[in-house]
């Protein structure tokens, strides 16, 4: 069974899995399509086309899997579809956070913002991990900026909240991301079989280890945090298009926005 997963990956054969299944626990109804592909049934994505699993396997010299004891149980009883999607989400949000920091710094330079809120000692005083990390990255990105110059133009003492606390909002996203990564790592590295077979005890136990509430709460929290980040970026963009606020041409366009 493990070799079938390996062979499909190495030969570029991807089982087609429904996005949604029946209402119930785990991904039982959807990821059974992986098992069906392994035995030569159902369709797969292969070299940019949708073909039958049997056709793709024949072209790659692979033989359909002959399922043994517990193989079907192993394929079906997991949350691999949801967990795999969450893993992709984690990767994309990590990249988004890094990009968000850099865009925020560009906004801050365009604003001629007050850099005091990003001071290391100020953020250590609060103690929020994501906030501290984001502030540190922003300070690094702004190294050499005119914002640190003694000859910089006059600036406001307190900037609008989405500027003054923009990196803190990104930090909140990072805190939510840490939560998701913690529970995702636990779930993808532990079994969710029901019943579970414990070889050391030579026994079988009924359980509910397929329950994903901890991970689901984290993903929902991350979605809320991303909504806050999106709102903050939108408000900063609106501000940057206001000449009475930036003292720059309207919409940052030449000839006063015409």
Model-derived regions, located:
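Active-site cavity-forming subdomains of large catalytic enzyme subunits
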Residues: 1-125
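C-terminal catalytic subdomain
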Residues: 213-258
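Active-site-adjacent bridging/hinge elements
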Residues: 72-76, 193-202, 240-244
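Short clusters of hydrophobic/aromatic residues that line enzyme substrate/ligand-binding pockets
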Residues: 44, 196, 252
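Accessory "access/gating" subregions that flank catalytic or transport cores
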Residues: 108-231
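A short glycine/serine-rich beta->alpha loop
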Residues: 14-23, 64, 204-213, 252-258
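Acidic, glycine-rich active-site loops and adjacent beta-strand->loop/helix elements
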Residues: 5, 9, 21-23, 202, ...
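Short acidic-hydrophobic sequence patches enriched in Asp/Glu that either
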Residues: 99, 130, 134, 258
């Amino acid at each position: 069974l493990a070799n079938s997963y390996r062979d499909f990956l190495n030969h570029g054969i991807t089982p087609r899995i429904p996005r949604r299944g029946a209402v119930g626990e785990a991904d039982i109804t959807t990821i059974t399509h992986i098992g069906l592909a392994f035995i030569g049934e159902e369709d797969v994505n292969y070299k940019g086309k949708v073909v039958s699993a049997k056709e793709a396997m024949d072209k790659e010299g692979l033989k359909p899997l002959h399922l043994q004891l517990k193989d079907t149980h192993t394929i079906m009883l997991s949350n691999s579809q949801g967990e795999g999607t969450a893993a992709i989400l984690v990767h994309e949000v990590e990249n988004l956070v890094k990009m968000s920091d850099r865009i925020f710094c560009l906004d801050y330079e365009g604003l001629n913002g007050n850099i005091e809120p990003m001071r290391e000692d100020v953020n250590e005083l609060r103690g929020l991990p994501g906030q501290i990390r984001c502030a540190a990255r922003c300070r690094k990105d702004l190294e050499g900026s005119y914002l640190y110059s003694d000859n910089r133009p006059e600036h406001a003492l307190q900037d609008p909240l989405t500027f003054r606390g923009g990196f803190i909002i990104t930090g909140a996203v990072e805190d939510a991301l840490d939560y998701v990564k913690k529970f995702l790592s636990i779930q993808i590295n532990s079994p969710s079989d029901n019943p579970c077979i414990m070889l050391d005890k030579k026994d079988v136990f009924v359980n509910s280890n397929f329950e994903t509430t901890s991970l689901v709460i984290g993903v929902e929290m991350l979605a809320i945090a991303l909504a806050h980040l999106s709102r903050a970026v939108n408000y900063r963009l609106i501000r940057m298009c206001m000449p009475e606020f930036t003292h720059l041409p309207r919409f940052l366009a030449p000839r006063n926005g015409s």
